[in-house]
Amino acid sequence: MSNTQSVTAVAKYIRMSPHKIRRVLDQIRGRSYQEALMILEFLPYDAGGPIWQVIHSAAANAKHNSGLDKKKLIIDKVFADEGPKLKRIRPRAQGRAYKILKPTCHITVVMKAID
């Protein structure tokens, strides 16, 4: 039985819809660290930027805190949860106001080392 360590990184209050983030997360779930970075580099979605940062942070945590090699890391779990919504109003005719909800999300990446 092998003893696998896992490391976590979380990015909170990302100003993007969790639905759009999850579309990209589904592409990299279960991939190796280097393969995930390559996929994110060439995807045409803006969600790739914040996800790329979180994956880099998780790899840095693995190297600095646990002494793990970045080349042996795989993405074990990755998910995006809803954050609070920024509430804004849009003025409309005759004194009315329409509500605008700007979504935020929290991205969590859990990586583990393979032997």
Swiss-Prot record:
SUPFAM superfamilies linked: Ribosomal protein L22
Subcellular location: Plastid, Chloroplast
Main location group: plastid
Keyword ATP-binding applies: no
Gene Ontology molecular function terms on file: rRNA binding; structural constituent of ribosome
Taxonomic superkingdom: Eukaryota
Keyword Ribonucleoprotein tagged: yes
Cellular component terms (Gene Ontology): chloroplast; large ribosomal subunit
Pfam family of the protein (one): Ribosomal_L22
GO biological process, one term: translation
Keywords assigned by UniProt, alphabetized: Chloroplast, Plastid, Ribonucleoprotein, Ribosomal protein, RNA-binding, rRNA-binding
Described function: This protein binds specifically to 23S rRNA.
Family: Belongs to the universal ribosomal protein uL22 family.
PANTHER family for this protein: CHLOROPLAST 50S RIBOSOMAL PROTEIN L22-RELATED (PTHR13501), LARGE RIBOSOMAL SUBUNIT PROTEIN UL22M (PTHR13501:SF10)
HAMAP family per record: Ribosomal_uL22_B
Self-association state and partner proteins as the record states: Part of the 50S ribosomal subunit.
The protein's name: Large ribosomal subunit protein uL22c
Gene name, Swiss-Prot/TrEMBL: rpl22
